[in-house]
């Protein structure tokens, strides 16, 4: 497995990965109400994130296969962390998290994530704690979490 900076050519595969996992955090299986989310994970939107200086976007791949993707926004918010179902529970999320954490802004006091309810335990293992109640916004359910930027989680 190789972790590297995402390039615009990765956008199609990243978008497909995220869309394939969407049923795990959508409020409605049909996607009703999540139009804003869907707009934000199109290949064009992903290309914009990859190219924008506010984002640090990484992928994990093996040969030509994209296994996972992660993005840090503004040096302190874990914006995306998705692993293909066939490669979950193999340490890929942890490896991406380590690489993303290393890219955090030097002055960041904490890192945040809006965790999918089924991913809370994973983020807790990474050192995050729940900082607010479950929220439902734009057709998506999430739980706000925070981790100290300087602490070694794991």
List each model region and its residues.
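Conserved GNAT-fold acetyl-CoA-binding loop/helix
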Residues: 19-45
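A short helix-loop-beta-strand connector motif used in the catalytic cores of GNAT acetyltransferases and
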Residues: 43-58, 77
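A short beta-loop-alpha structural element at the N-terminal edge
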Residues: 2-16
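Conserved acetyl-CoA-binding loop-helix of GNAT-fold acetyltransferases
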Residues: 89-102
């Amino acid at each position: 497995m190789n972790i590297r900076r995402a390039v615009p050519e990765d956008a199609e595969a990243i978008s497909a990965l995220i869309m394939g996992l969407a049923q795990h955090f959508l409020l409605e299986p049909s996607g009703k109400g999540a139009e804003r989310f869907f707009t934000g994970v199109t290949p064009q939107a992903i290309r914009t994130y990859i190219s924008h200086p506010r984002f640090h976007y990484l992928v994990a791949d093996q040969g030509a296969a994209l296994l996972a993707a992660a993005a840090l926004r503004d040096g302190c918010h874990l914006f995306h962390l998705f692993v293909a179902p066939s490669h979950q529970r193999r340490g890929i999320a942890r490896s991406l998290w380590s690489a993303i954490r290393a890219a955090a802004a030097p002055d960041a006091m904490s890192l945040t994530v809006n965790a999918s309810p089924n991913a809370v335990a994973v983020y807790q293992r990474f050192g995050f704690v729940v900082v607010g109640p479950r929220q439902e916004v734009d057709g998506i359910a999430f739980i706000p979490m925070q981790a100290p930027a300087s602490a070694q989680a794991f």
